[in-house]
Amino acid sequence: MIERSMVKSYLHYVVPATIAFTLTCIYSIVDGIFVGNIVGDTGLAGINVAYPLYALVLATGTGIGMGGAVISSIREGSGNREGARHATGHTILMLLLFSIPVTLLLLFFARPLCAVLGGAGETLNQAVLYLSVLSLAAPLQVMIVGCLPLIRNRGHVKYAMVASVVSGVINVIFDYVFVVALNWGTMGAGAATALAQCCSFLLIAAFFLRKNERLGLRHFKPNTELFAHSLKLGLAPFGLTLLPEITVVTLNVNALIYGGETAVAAYAVISYVAYVIQMLIQGVADGSQPLVSQCYGAGKLKLVQKIRNTNFVVAISIGLIGLGVMTALRYQIPSWFGASEAATEIVAFALPVIAFAYMFFGLTHVSTSYFYATDDARGSSLLVYGEAALVVLYTCGLGFVYGLTGVWGAIGMTQITLAFVAAVLLRRHSHKRLGLTSVHKGHKAAAHRHIAAAGR
């Protein structure tokens, strides 16, 4: 655990990020509440089917942005300020380039992709309506989510939080106008999100136009090594954002097989609520990333470990509290979304089962963030992409044997398995990279050589 002298710095990074992550999630839930009560189960199911494609937009920005932000922070910590600014400018250039193919994909292939993701009949129509407007703002969304880590890593965590909060408030206001007042349904929810992103983009652009933050043309100079390094580190954050949608798709398909459209609508409610716990934990993990990366770049390796251990305690506590709250409110929560009586019964049974997994989710996801914050792309990617593979295996296997009950239980089994893998990787990481478990100088020298290489 960190000492008292570090608590202020720790909270300076973690609290605004956690608030921003959580409020963004709550605004998404408001989308679901409006659509669920106005359109009904098919509207909820449609957004649930479409969301993996929207998550691709978020993942593209998050992966590139976080990869570049980690490099920038490590360079800043090692004293290479010019290199840090180059990493920032190069990341913005990459965000611009990668936003183009993602936008074209959503514009021209939304319907066939939604069909592959489990959409059919009216559910498919609702999914396409949602994406039809949302895709128009996709380039802005890539830029926004990619630049937020850069802003946080430059120490302006409150500014990043304000940008997220303003976007969310505008989203809620236009949700009411478009979905409720104008009765535009799921298309209105998409339009509200798109307009909110336009406003958020103005705040992001204003930040980088400030005198102290303005970048020169030399900072946007393409660099193949920096390009490759950013993508390598960004693989895990990309996966953290996108691959949970593999969970959604896998559970949607299996829920449809073993419980019909009612089970799919029930899982839409569950995924909204579970998302709150995920974002609280991810806020702790990613909120502390700038601090971890800077300390790692400066060679303060024992402090890095203390921050990580503090994250474990906080994240696991959040998981335990989430389990208690979801269990206590398992019958009330479905009514917020206008769920049918049949869907409510499924949610009431499944919610505590799935919430149990979040005790282990804290360990696995803090570990993932810790690995990429310390320039260990291999460890972070193994956990992220291993989770996706395990979800498919456990869901299909347990669903085949135990039906719908097995589908819900697969999430817990996945996180328990990953927690064991994370513990093994953490032990190896401490031995090989940080050198914290050995007094031999060779271990420490190797760690410092790695830091120096990352700073170049």
Predicted regions: what they are:
Residues I26-A45, C114-G121, V177-W184, E245-V276, ...:
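Helix-terminus/linker motif at the lipid-water interface of multi-pass membrane proteins
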Residues A17, F21, I33, V70, ...:
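Transmembrane alpha-helix boundary and packing residues in multipass membrane permease domains
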